């Protein structure tokens, strides 16, 4: 499983700055979808060869009301379930009572915690950080998140034990190179074959009390009983095998499948980290939304994360029965307005309690998975690229036309198209979006994001041992060029 890093600390110590720096390599993917909220509290990071989930738990006051009451339940859950906690402090402000209250809470939890003294730029860092040793959480690490100083070393130190335990490999890539990595055609082919031999992993996610457990029980059959309060189920999602119409599935249940008597509980413990890990591990994500409440910011945040990791999407609007027609029209209008950035995802209106519309969900799940894993040949992708250029030529860059040469598959789930050419790194985002939409229409991709990446064509003469002209050869060359110009006149 991918490691989870939680950022903890009082307000204004630099958590958001560090969060943005860690996740910035993925922001461009979200920017391709206008209308998606950018105010995210969790995201996927890729730094120095490590991939991990980072969660900003929000600021904690540590006032006299007590830390337990001041922290949101989800922030507490994030600390409980994270693999690593980075406890940020302000080196310029020094040690505060709020810092001590947070440290006391973390000591009681016995979490793997690293104290980070942020904002050490422009001050005597060693003397400023000395007092933070009194927190009793071990070594104090210096960082200037705004400038990026100490960030990479901190992450490497914090994640190395987890990387070794989970078999993650360090490839030594820097931030830029890691994000630009492309699958070769051979790797993409192998990935596609691997996916064909595995069951479809379907993660059912959503806010508390939208009917995830009811829907899961409806899919599995009411007679299926899985005990929720077993050891281990509080941290990890439950993986349930299922066969339907000859297709094998694995349902990843983030809410926990309750006994029938408990399905209608009014309060459900929601775990952000459990949900994010389920999205990471899934092939297709089924987002359940309550028709009576509509799309919430939390839903948009989950959708943004699913897009970032390239998962296929299906949306189920639950509790559709018993709503007046005018309310239904209003809900549909809101969905069109707020979900325009994922117009490729199928939306189903269902009643998990009564089973209405549930069967059709699997048609969209299979369609999305087929789109995400369908093999497309290099010749087909190159032909579509040429058709797109005929419809809309690439722009001029410094007086020269950007030249696109050929395209091939770079990966699956999500489908990745790699286009090779000259000056492609200078292409404007508008043209990149045009190419992405052109491929989506041409390939009839439905239910999954599609990524188009551009790779600079190599210089075939680079590295050749070209000899420098002698003085006499240089003179002869000039005479020949002059002669050619005279003839043209």
From Swiss-Prot:
Any idea where the EngA-type G domain is? 3-166, 200-373
Please state what the protein is called: GTPase Der
CDD domains, per database record: EngA1, EngA2
What processes in GO biological process is this protein linked to? ribosome biogenesis
Report the Pfam families cross-referenced here.
Answer: KH_dom-like (PF14714), MMR_HSR1 (PF01926)
- For whether the record's keyword set contains GTP-binding, the answer is yes
Presence of the UniProt keyword Lyase in the record:
no
Binding residues annotated for GTP 2, in chain numbering: 206-213, 253-257, 318-321
Q: Which family does it belong to?
A: Belongs to the TRAFAC class TrmE-Era-EngA-EngB-Septin-like GTPase superfamily. EngA (Der) GTPase family.
Summarizing the function annotation, the protein's role is: GTPase that plays an essential role in the late steps of ribosome biogenesis.
The record describes its quaternary structure and partners as:
Associates with the 50S ribosomal subunit.
**Assigned keywords, A-Z:** GTP-binding, Nucleotide-binding, Repeat, Ribosome biogenesis
GO MF annotation terms: GTP binding; ribosome binding
Query: Which residues does the UniProt record annotate as the domain KH-like?
Result: 374-458
Q: Which residues form a coiled coil?
A: none
Q: Which organism is it from?
A: Shewanella loihica (strain ATCC BAA-1088 / PV-4)
Annotated GTP 1 binding sites: 9-16, 56-60, 118-121
The domain of life is Bacteria
């Amino acid at each position: 499983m991918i490691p989870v890093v939680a950022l903890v600390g009082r307000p204004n110590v630099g958590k958001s700055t560090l969060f943005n720096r860690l996740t910035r390599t993925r922001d461009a993917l979200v920017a391709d979808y206008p209308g998606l909220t950018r105010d995210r509290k969790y995201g996927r990071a890729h730094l120095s060869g490590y991939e991990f989930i980072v969660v900003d738990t929000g600021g904690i006051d540590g006032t006299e009301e007590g830390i337990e009451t001041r922290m949101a339940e989800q922030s507490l859950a994030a600390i409980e379930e994270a693999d690593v906690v980075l406890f940020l402090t302000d080196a310029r402000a020094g040690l505060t009572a709020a810092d001590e209250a947070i440290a006391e809470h973390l000591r009681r939890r016995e979490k793997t915690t690293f104290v980070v003294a942020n904002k050490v730029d422009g001050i005597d860092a060693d003397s400023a950080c000395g007092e933070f040793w009194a927190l009793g959480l071990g070594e104090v690490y210096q960082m200037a998140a705004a400038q990026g100083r100490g960030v990479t070393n901190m992450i490497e130190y914090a994640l190395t034990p987890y990387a070794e335990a989970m078999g993650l490999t360090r490839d030594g890539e820097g931030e830029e190179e890691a994000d630009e990595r492309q699958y070769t055609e051979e790797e993409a082919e192998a990935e596609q074959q691997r996916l064909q031999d595995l069951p479809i992993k379907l993660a059912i996610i959503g806010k508390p009390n939208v009917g995830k457990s009811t829907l899961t029980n409806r899919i599995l059959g009411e007679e299926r009983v899985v005990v929720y309060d077993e050891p281990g189920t509080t941290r990890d999602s439950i993986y349930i095998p299922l066969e339907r119409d000859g297709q094998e599935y694995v349902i990843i249940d983030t809410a926990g499948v309750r006994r029938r008597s408990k399905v209608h509980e009014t309060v459900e413990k929601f775990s952000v980290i459990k949900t994010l890990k389920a999205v990471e591990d899934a092939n297709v994500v089924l987002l359940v939304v309550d028709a009576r409440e509509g799309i919430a910011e939390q839903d948009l945040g989950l959708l943004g994360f699913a897009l970032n990791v390239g998962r296929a999407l299906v949306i189920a609007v639950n509790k559709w029965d018993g709503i007046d027609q005018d309310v239904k029209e209003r809900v549909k209008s809101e969905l069109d307005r707020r979900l325009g950035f994922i117009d490729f995802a199928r939306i189903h209106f269902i009643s998990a309690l009564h089973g209405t519309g549930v069967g059709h969900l699997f048609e969209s799940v299979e369609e999305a998975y087929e789109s995400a894993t369908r093999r497309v040949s290099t010749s087909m992708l190159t032909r579509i690229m040429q058709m797109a250029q005929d419809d809309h030529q690439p722009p001029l860059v410094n007086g020269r036309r950007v030249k696109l040469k050929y395209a091939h598959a770079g990966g699956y789930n999500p489908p990745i198209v790699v286009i090779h050419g000259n000056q492609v790194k200078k292409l404007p985002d508008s043209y990149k979006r045009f190419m992405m939409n052109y491929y989506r229409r041409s390939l009839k991709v439905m239910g999954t994001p599609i990524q188009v990446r551009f790779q600079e064509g190599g210089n075939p003469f680079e590295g050749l041992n070209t000899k420098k002209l002698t003085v006499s050869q240089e003179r002869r060359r000039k005479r020949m060029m002059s002669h050619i110009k005279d003839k043209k006149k």
